Amino acid sequence: MTASHGTAPSPFKQPRAVWAVAFACVVSFMGIGLVDPILPALAGSLHATPSQVSLLFTSYLVVTAVAMLAVGWVSSRIGAKRTLIAGLVLIVIFAGLAGTSNSIGGIVGFRAGWGLGNALFIATSLAVIVASASGGFAGAIILYETALGLGIAVGPLLGGELGSISWRGPFFGVAVLMFIALVATIAFVPNLPKPEHKTSLAAPLKALRHRGLLTMGIMALLYNWGFFTMLGYAPYPMELNAHKLGLVFTGWGLLVAAFSVFFAPRLQARFGTAKVLYVNLFCLGIVMAVIAIGVNTPAAVIVAVIVSGAFIGINNTLTTQAVMLVSPVERPVASSAYGFVRFIGGGLAPFVAGKLADATNLSVPFYLGGVAFILAIVVLASGHKLVDAAEKGAVEGEPVCPSLQRVGATPAPGYQPVIVAVGAIENADEIVDAAALMARDAGRPLEVVHIRETAVVEELAIDAEDAEQARATVLSHLDRLFTLGIAATGQVLTSVGDHAAAGRVLAQHANDIDARAIAVGRSPRGQAAQFADGSFTTAVLHNAARTVVMVEPGKAPHRLSA
């Protein structure tokens, strides 16, 4: 939440505990793509029909969906590390057993156990990385997103290479890699404190009573119906071996990762969540129609699948953003409820597609998938006003659009302060104190604006700190400044995902109160992350009719230019 100029601290200088979990994240995110290249080989070797093989997705995703309802209850009682380890143990056991199986029914059953482990793992991995990372919240999120992108992109490639040796290869590969991650997690990840309050088992289902969350959840269900129809059945009409299928889905995965991390936030910031989703879902419907029409033309299917990666990457990010926008409940509960509905759609789609393909022909499931994408537009339209209201801040619950909350005494009108914007970073005190000296020299009071960040990654949303912690941080700054004889006031600026939007809100606030100047520190996020979801400082520079300066401990403040 600070300036982009200069060199940011590297998010990759982390303790061994973080690398252990990040490695496991890469392998976990490989999960779906790893299996795709071996689907035709699996069907041939075990004399199974495509509809029978599709149950690998159904058992995995349906169990993951149901387990998402309970992961909050489990982790709030046994702690994040134990939940993480339990998930890893289950993945190792059931991935290994799937590799030893000689029947499609056995693999389907073992994939269900794998899905349970995956739910326990993905629900806690981000929290463990954030809790264990050095260099602050931003570095932890960058590392997690890197693991996400790497896993999605590399999974199909590894699956294709191992699958070209034997269809058992990807299963044994996951088991071995996750066992390494399990040992490293046990050895290096410290015990983390349990949450202060326990999550109710019924909380995610109760959350679905809220119209906004249920509406966005149904939209996600329909989207995942189309997505997993394509993922489960597109390999067959391509008529490629495991190695070449791996290359195709690697190209797809690279686009998913790139558009999810780098392009989706920028499109959202420019056009709004709902508008981008409308266009994106429509494009996915067209892609599915192309696959259905060209189901007997392998080249057409290959190109359509690779291109779909761009739209899927955007949708994966913005669908979660839409859920968080309209959700009036705590974000972990909203994530669990959303994950449940989302994965149910993904799990049922391959099963239904298989039955349709057996009864008709292979093009029909793809037509149905296209219809699901179009129906998702209709459902989104029914909740459009809720999304718009949330983006404007006119909803109850946790704030999603950037918003300022006063901490401490309200200043008198016309106080024209120097504003310092700073997040929950290691040298926050030094940045505030440097800005305080600048304010004192200018004969103006200081206003401390503390940035409270929430990151949204896939179906997960995690806060750098809760509201009380952010408030306590501001009060700590104010108390310290009081002892130094510097007049100061405080605010908390809540930011969810979109850093540039937070910068625009701060700029408008500075204009409204006729602030003398705005001081920022050096960004801990780096250039790539700032390109992805917008630079806070750049947004301030472009929107504030004020002087913007960078302050660094031990250095003279210097003015920034747009």
Language-model region placement:
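C-terminal transmembrane helical hairpin of 12-TM major facilitator-type secondary transporters
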Residues: A274-T319
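C-terminal membrane-cytosol helix-exit motif in multi-pass small-molecule transporters
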Residues: A175-K194, I377-H384
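Helix-to-loop junctions at the C-terminal end of transmembrane segments
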Residues: M68-G79, F259-T273, A357
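Helix-loop-helix hairpin linking two adjacent transmembrane segments in secondary transporters
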Residues: I142-A187
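Small/aliphatic-rich secondary-structure junction motif
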Residues: P411-I462, I486-T489, N543
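Conserved MFS/SLC helix-loop-helix module at the cytosolic interface between two early adjacent transmembrane helices
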Residues: V66-N102
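Cytoplasmic helix-loop-helix junction between adjacent transmembrane helices
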Residues: F110-L150
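Glycine-rich, Arg-bearing micro-motifs that act as flexible, cationic patches
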Residues: A517-N543, P557-L560
